[in-house]
Amino acid sequence: MECLANYQQMVDPTMVWRSIKSNDAVRMDVSFTWKKEEWLIPAVFPIPGGLAVDVARKLPYYHLKNCLTIYEKRRNAGFHSPLERLMIDQYDPFHFHPMGHLLTENDCIDEWRSERFIWNPLRMSPATPKEYYPARKLVEHYGFDLNTGWVIFRLYFKGDFLSVRD
């Protein structure tokens, strides 16, 4: 994560977000382990008035299969109270929402907003079919293994000193 404070490369800020181009990103290739899981920061993007950071959580196939099997079994068991639904969600490997903070030399910037892309090679719930194509496109764009589950969070940070200027 230390590379984020050293963001110096100038990139065209007029990019279109829905069409991801390889020359729009500053490749980071930073990885770290948190809570015994592998996480990656594949790229950083400039946005008007700020910066966007992609953070990817890797879900190995065996872990994904075990969690989703338990999740499906409990979900299909019949009526569930709100408390039981919350208990079931603990087995959903995609049910995770980090809150991003960008540390700079003088400040800590909280995430402005975020998007989540879920890649589930098993195509079992809870990922919906409408999420499938954009997530696959993003996983292929970064060269991630399609046989592994991925949750990619795109975290947006706003700040005047993060702006890309000519």
What positions do the PLM features span?
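Alpha-helical, hydrophobic structural elements that either
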Residues: M1-D166
